[in-house]
From Swiss-Prot:
Function: Component of the large ribosomal subunit. The ribosome is a large ribonucleoprotein complex responsible for the synthesis of proteins in the cell.
Residues the record lists as N-acetylserine modifications: 2
Record cross-link Glycyl lysine isopeptide (Lys-Gly) (interchain with G-Cter in SUMO2), residues: 58, 65
Localization of this protein: Cytoplasm
GO cellular component: cell body; cytoplasm; cytoplasmic ribonucleoprotein granule; cytosolic large ribosomal subunit; cytosolic ribosome; dendrite; synapse
A matching Pfam family: Ribosomal_L28e
Organism (species): Rattus norvegicus (Rat)
One function term, GO molecular function aspect: structural constituent of ribosome
Family: Belongs to the eukaryotic ribosomal protein eL28 family.
Name of protein: Large ribosomal subunit protein eL28
Length: 137
């Protein structure tokens, strides 16, 4: 089935839809922006890109759909773990999408999602408040 026909079926009746505050979001896997739109849908396209947090808390996992294994869902996704510093992680995601000519329209969304995940994994430094000496009269 073509992606457009699948979109016409899935767009208003999917178990991943969340309709709140006059907006429609989607919680499906490989949807980079969590928007219910044709471009970012992770179920209907032959090529999809997803970025997830690594379960250990350091690094990200890039999930790409194989073009060849469409009829075998168990083997249709390739998961690549990237556990480097932030700049190297983002550049390797950029190269994975650009050099393989793999959905260039999702490149910036994937980089932004990975950047947000890496930022959330950084430890939070608690700043101590300076105590002012009391004024003596």
């Amino acid at each position: 089935m073509s992606a457009h026909l699948q979109w016409m079926v899935v767009r208003n009746c999917s178990s991943f839809l969340i309709k709140r505050n006059k907006q429609t979001y989607s919680t499906e896997p490989n949807n980079l922006k969590a928007r219910n739109s044709f471009r970012y849908n992770g179920l209907i396209h032959r090529k999809t890109v997803g970025v997830e947090a690594w379960p250990d808390g350091k690094g990200v996992v890039v999930v790409m759909k194989r073009r060849s294994g469409q009829r075998k869902p168990a083997t249709s996704y390739v998961r690549t773990t990237i556990n480097k510093n932030a700049r190297a992680t983002l550049s390797s995601i950029r190269h994975m999408i650009r050099k393989n000519k793999y959905r260039p329209d999702l490149r910036m969304a994937a980089i932004r999602r990975a950047s947000a995940i890496l930022r959330s994994q950084k430890p939070v430094v608690v700043k101590r408040k300076r105590t002012r000496p009391t004024k003596s009269s």
